[in-house]
Amino acid sequence: FFELDGKHVLLTSPQDMLPEGLEYHTGNGTLCIIGEMDKDTYTLKEQFNQSVDYGIDFYAMQTVEAPDGRRIMIGWMQNWDTLAHRCNDSKWFAQMSLPRELSVKNGRLYQTPIKELDALRKNRVEYNDVVIENDTITLDRVEGRTIDMELVIRPEDKENVYKKFALRFAQNEKFHTELSFRPYESVLKIDRKFSGTERALVHQRRCLVNGDANELKLRVILDRFSAEVFINHG
């Protein structure tokens, strides 16, 4: 619980949740309540609520206030339902998320990678005005298992919007993970069913995207064992 940008914010990680549209999913989840604190009764008057993270594995987030006043959050990229699937010969299991800077805008909790990560960027590759026409393309030098990538996707003709955009990563001849967006539905989906797991785990998760459906902005940070996606600046 903390104060941020003129609002009071409560973060919690409920268990055994019931689904509610695309905002909340079954099982272990995350919840952010934004409102005003009544200092006389010590109660939080709720104004908005949302999931903290819309991915498949994110739980038990914690925050700290940095010396410069930033509110920084980190989360556990795992959940209680999959703890039994640890391989006996593995030296470690699960991991923590990247640190994220939090802010509150228009009743929503925004999250962006901390600015310190920018110092780790190198070997810059940039493409502009790439046109995709009913086909799959690969871009030279956009490769590897550790990437910090920013994309802006928009239709050439706003009156004739594309049906689906998909980005595949961690891909070889047999495996891949896919991130896709359908502008007519404003829905972004992560699909890891072809990532190589042999377990009957949750493989897909969808979320609604706020903002202009004619322009989608993504920042995808790909690690060897994870992918974190930030939509429309957080």
Where are these regions (language model features)?
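Hydrophobic core segments of beta-strands in well-ordered, beta-rich domains
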Residues: 7-20, 71-77, 81
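Beta-rich accessory regions
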Residues: 3, 31, 36-57, 62-234
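Structural motif
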Residues: 18-34
